[in-house]
UniProtKB/Swiss-Prot annotation:
It catalyses: L-threonine + hydrogencarbonate + ATP = L-threonylcarbamoyladenylate + diphosphate + H2O. Disulfide bonds: none annotated. SUPFAM superfamilies: YrdC/RibB. Belongs to the SUA5 family. TsaC subfamily. This is Threonylcarbamoyl-AMP synthase. It comes from Stenotrophomonas maltophilia (strain K279a). HAMAP family: TsaC. Required for the formation of a threonylcarbamoyl group on adenosine at position 37 (t(6)A37) in tRNAs that read codons beginning with adenine. Catalyzes the conversion of L-threonine, HCO(3)(-)/CO(2) and ATP to give threonylcarbamoyl-AMP (TC-AMP) as the acyladenylate intermediate, with the release of diphosphate.
């Protein structure tokens, strides 16, 4: 497995690669959400149906410009979303023009999070935008909380791994619908 530095992780992403990196609760797989082939590789690696859509993670709200339409939410819902970030809160927001079907799946919204995890935020800043962030496990298998738990079947197919520690959350981040406030994953 190729060990990555922050700079080599960014170079790998720019080349359409898929990397593993630690997130708030579990290890994640990441790629450029604009790179269709890279997103399809993540879906194949995880054996995840495209219809489910993907989560994007960013360092700040500006990185989500064009990906989401926050202004389409009522003011109170906008305030609730913004008050929860940066943090371990994933929201389904109305999708913007940059959000392609290989990221949104069969949905009109897109799942996004502005992370407070130091390495995730640093990676997104170095990359210059949001990244796909999905748990580094095969569909139906438990997610890896520690690097040692990463599935060797996935590891050998990745373009590299950015080492670090997860943020210590007991569960993956909750997912809520920003329009309704409904919790989709707790």
């Amino acid at each position: 497995m190729k060990e990555l530095t922050l700079d080599s992780a960014v170079a790998t992403l720019r080349a359409g690669g898929v990397i593993a990196y630690p997130t708030e609760a579990v290890w994640g797989l990441g790629c450029d959400p604009s790179h269709e082939a890279a997103v399809h590789m993540v879906l194949r690696l995880k054996q995840r149906p495209i219809e489910k859509g993907m989560i994007l993670v960013a360092a700040d709200l500006a990185q989500l410009e064009g990906w989401v339409r926050l202004q389409a939410l009522p003011d109170a819902r906008q305030r609730a979303v913004l008050a929860s970030w940066p943090g371990a809160n994933t929201w389904i927001l109305p999708a913007g023009p940059r959000a392609q079907p290989w990221v949104t799946g069969e949905h009109s919204g897109i799942a996004v999070r502005i992370s407070a995890h130091p390495l995730v935020a640093e990676l997104c800043r170095a990359w210059g935008g949001p990244l796909v962030s999905t748990s580094a496990n095969l569909a139906g298998e438990p997610p890896a909380r520690r690097r040692e738990e990463l599935d060797p079947r996935l590891l050998r197919l990745l373009d590299g791994i950015l080492d670090g520690e997860t943020g210590g959350l007991a569960q993956p981040t909750p997912i809520r619908d920003a329009l309704s406030g409904n919790v989709l994953r707790s």
